[in-house]
A protein has these predicted regions:
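Helix-loop boundary and gating motifs at the non-cytosolic
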Residues: 2-57, 212-262
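Hydrophobic core of transmembrane alpha-helices in multi-pass small-molecule transporters
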Residues: 20, 101-119, 228, 296, ...
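Structural signature of transmembrane alpha-helices in multi-pass secondary transporters
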Residues: 22-23, 54, 113, 144-151, ...
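Intracellular juxtamembrane helix-capping segments at the cytosolic ends
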Residues: 33, 119-132, 322-335
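Helix-terminus/helix-capping segments at the ends of transmembrane helices and short amphipathic helices
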Residues: 38, 128-133, 138, 245, ...
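C-terminal transmembrane bundle of multi-pass solute transporters/carriers
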Residues: 50, 60-64, 71, 75-77, ...
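Hydrophobic alpha-helical transmembrane segments
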Residues: 103-110, 114, 136-195, 253, ...
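Flexible cytoplasmic inter-helical loops of multi-pass small-molecule transporters
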Residues: 136, 186-212, 399-406
Length: 410
């Protein structure tokens, strides 16, 4: 099979193009919202509410949306969610015109945007398998991820520089990008698979089985919960507008660069891991990576130099990539095939929404103790979690090879 096999139809380029456009628009918009809301309210709590407004619908809708994506055409679900995101960009534009000094209308639109994400992410995950045969899936996933990583790196920087032209220009660009993304998604071809409907009780029983599986496997539970609490405590992304404006004095352009820095570290680390994968002492590497994430977060909080702050954010992204690589590998090896969908839904529900909940925690802590102490305390909290999890989950700490997580055959 040649390297170009997965590109022989228009569907894969259209699918990837749709994902790149929606990812870019989301990240550009997040930079604009963060700067605009903080500019209006001048309190870190306002930035925490930005995360909370998205977290509640995202957390509530992830599992139902995943089940819905199995019963209806995921292309329709994805296109509809992206149209909803485009509507949100239009509403942000309207709020900027009609209510330029009040954040409350923006919070309502953010909740709608979180609901749209709750539907778009499960649909995106399920759609690729509809578009390519099994033998082309691995290459399609690899190419999709590489281009999305480019979007994650470039999106915040583009958002910061776009915002120098004003929020109206930024939201207008996002609206157009979401509409184009929806058009590409709606035009996708591919294979349809009818999974059939099931009773509500049966769906929730399947979800409960996934939760029980995670709870009963120390390696899986430890890996998922370690990542969850590290992001909750150590994430500083929500407070970057405060640092850009009041600490480092670099404006919205600098904010975009700060937001891109973790993705740069993650991308470089992903390239390194692809060439030199972790083969031994996987558990030790996992805990060291999370500890490094916490330490770099503390150093970022204490920094007053823009370039040192960039380096520390790159380190957090690199450490997070190592953690994600090991966690995903351990969970995949530990989970038998019949349980993969349910375990994946559970981990996505808790880890996928933890960024927004972590944003709220950061905003609350900063409102109580100040921005810099909040970041330092969060990084220190991550180190405490690492020490506690080493004692609570010794099987995770002692994992050598990633394949050691494979359950024994009885």
């Amino acid at each position: 099979m040649t390297g170009s096999t997965v590109y022989r139809t228009r569907d894969i380029p259209a699918f990837i193009g749709s994902g790149v456009l929606s990812t870019l628009a989301s990240l550009v918009q997040s930079v604009a919202i963060g700067w605009q809301v903080y500019d209006m309210e001048r309190t870190p709590l306002a930035l925490g509410l930005v995360g909370l407004c998205q977290f509640v619908p995202l957390f509530a809708l992830t599992l139902p949306a995943g089940e819905l994506a199995d019963r209806i055409d995921p292309r329709r679900l994805l296109a509809g969610a992206q149209i909803m995101q485009a509507v949100c960009s239009g509403l942000f534009l309207l709020c900027t015109v009609l209510s330029p000094h009040r954040a409350l209308p923006f919070y309502f639109v953010l909740a709608l945007f979180g609901a749209a994400r709750g539907f778009s992410e499960p649909a995106t995950q399920s759609l690729l398998a509809f578009l390519v045969p099994p033998e082309g899936l691995a290459k399609a996933i690899a190419r999709n991820n590489s281009l999305l990583t480019t979007s994650v790196i470039g999106g915040p920087a583009v958002g910061g520089f776009l915002y120098t032209a004003g929020p109206m220009a930024t939201y207008s660009v996002c609206l157009v990008a979401f509409v184009a993304s929806a058009a590409l998604a709606a035009g996708l071809g591919g294979r349809r698979v009818d999974h059939g409907a099931s009773h509500l009780a049966e769906r929730w029983e399947r979800v409960a089985e996934g939760i029980r599986f995670v709870r009963q496997r120390p390696i899986v539970l430890g890996a998922v919960s370690l990542d969850l609490f590290a992001v909750l405590l150590g994430g500083a992304a929500a407070l970057l507008p405060v640092f850009a404006r009041d600490v480092l004095h670099v404006g919205p352009g600098g904010l975009g660069i700060l937001r891109s820095a973790p993705a740069v570290g993650a991308a470089l680390t992903a390239f390194f891991l692809a060439r030199f994968p972790i083969e031994r002492r996987s558990g030790t590497h996992l805990f060291v990576a999370v500890a490094l994430f916490g330490a770099a977060t503390m150093a970022f909080g204490l920094s007053r130099n823009f370039y040192l702050s960039l380096v520390m954010l790159c380190v957090t992204g690199a450490a997070d990539m190592v953690s994600v690589f090991i966690r995903q590998s351990l969970i995949n090896f530990a989970t038998p095939d019949p349980m993969r969908g349910r375990v994946g839904a559970v981990t996505m529900m808790f880890i996928g929404a933890s960024n927004e909940l972590g944003d709220f925690e950061s905003g609350m802590t900063a409102a109580l103790f100040g921005t810099i102490p909040a970041v330092v305390i969060g990084g220190l909290g991550t180190l405490v979690v690492v020490a506690a999890w080493m004692r609570l989950f010794p099987p995770l700490w002692k994992v050598d090879r990633l394949t050691d997580a494979v359950p024994a055959v009885s």
